[in-house]
Amino acid sequence: MKSSNLLFTTSWVILLIVSGAIVLISAGSLWRGYSGTPDGLTPEYGLSQIEEQGGALATKAFRGRRVTAATWAIGYALLAIAVTWIPYRRGERWAWWALLISLGLSQLLSLARALALATTVGLATPALLLAFVLLGLLAGVPRVFTRLNLKSEG
């Protein structure tokens, strides 16, 4: 029982850390989009080249896409924190599935760019996030899906 509690505590702590990291990284991306900090498509092709090719409107659109993506990521990470902190810590099965779908599926879709777009640039981040999400969720399986917990929900 003691090891089960430790494993479950490890589970929700990992999920909170992953969700918190998403908030912090996305906040940095949001700041980069709003502040005009040097940015670019690739290390060789930055905002100045985008402006040369497409004008000021293209640069604003590029920065706007970064801001939009960052705000969505912050929103879903804050929701993941709330789901982890309250229902998941109570051992509610739906919360486990919700976290798997929201955190896991989003990273799988991000990894799909390797096949769909034939690019591996930026794959490390979703791969690491997916690995830690799966680690956190797998550590919670014994607590969330035990017979005792299933009987109390049924």
Question: Which functions belong to the PLM regions below?
Answer:
Residues 1-154:
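Topology signature of small-to-medium multi-pass alpha-helical membrane proteins
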